[in-house]
A protein has these predicted regions:
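Alpha-helical bundle regulatory/interaction domains
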Residues: 1-160, 164-169, 179-184, 198-201, ...
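DNA major-groove recognition helix of helix-turn-helix
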Residues: 176, 188, 225-226, 237
């Protein structure tokens, strides 16, 4: 979950505790202090999040394009971003069933989620509660390896990854849809966009940054930023640059 914020809103990430990096990517906290109900742009990043909004636990499913979230002025969100390859096993369903959706955890877990929400409503620390939910999660090592391949600055092409991971092409497609909510090619596009945001500050121009991130040329970058983020490359960097 990568957000666009007003100048007075705040977003802070905290690293996962030692020993949980294979299950938790990070913890985060967002406070909305802009115009009431002003939309917040959430970029796809290859992850899913568990979010406590003060009333309910929400699962932010895997996005294939930017989502616009309406958040009340003064609202505080506490979230946990799951490590890749963890969500399907933890939640108990393939992630393609949650693609581009925000779903109450109670719809998936029933009374168990209600008990956790009661503890949060009574004032228990959201970070500690969210971490406890993930303590028994079992990562999928081959899906984590795939994510690492595609996320790296020297990203591997999708072609050939199935054999490297010990899958047929068909099995890889199914496993990716279960683990990430979409196929490897979509994951590759999403992680390339995130890589562009990471690498852009190193370059004076957009074309050099695009090539470094793995785009074939500047028009390729422009197509992907429009389709995935709903923004031009320059607008994307202005709103989400690191």
């Amino acid at each position: 979950m990568t957000t666009t914020m007003s100048d007075v809103s705040s977003y802070r990430e905290m690293p996962a505790p030692s020993g949980m990096h294979d299950r938790v990517a990070c913890l985060w906290r967002f406070r909305q202090a802009g115009i009431a109900g002003a939309p917040v742009r959430v970029l796809p990043d290859g992850h899913i999040d568990l979010i406590w909004d003060g009333r309910a636990l929400i699962v932010a499913g895997p996005d294939t394009a930017a989502a616009m979230a309406s958040i009340d002025d003064g609202a505080v969100l506490n979230g946990l971003r799951l490590a890749p390859g963890v969500g399907a096993g933890l939640l108990g369903l393939p992630l393609h069933r949650l693609a581009n959706q925000r779903v109450a955890l109670a719809e998936l877990w029933g009374a168990r989620a209600n008990r956790v929400e009661d503890a949060l409503a009574e004032g228990q620390d959201p970070a500690a509660v969210l971490l406890a939910l993930c303590a028994g999660a079992v990562p999928d090592p081959r899906m984590q390896r795939l994510f690492g391949f595609l996320q790296s600055d020297e990203a591997s092409p999708v072609t050939g990854l199935a054999a490297a991971l010990g899958f047929s092409e068909r099995s890889l497609r199914r496993r990716c849809q279960d683990a990430f909510g979409y196929g490897a090619k979509t994951l590759d596009r999403i992680l390339r966009l995130q890589r562009f945001l990471k690498l852009a500050p190193r370059h004076a121009g957009l074309t050099a940054a695009a090539l470094d991130a793995g785009y074939s040329d500047a028009p390729h970058l422009a197509r992907d930023t429009q389709q995935l983020a709903g923004l031009s490359p320059r607008a994307l960097l202005a709103q989400h640059g690191r």
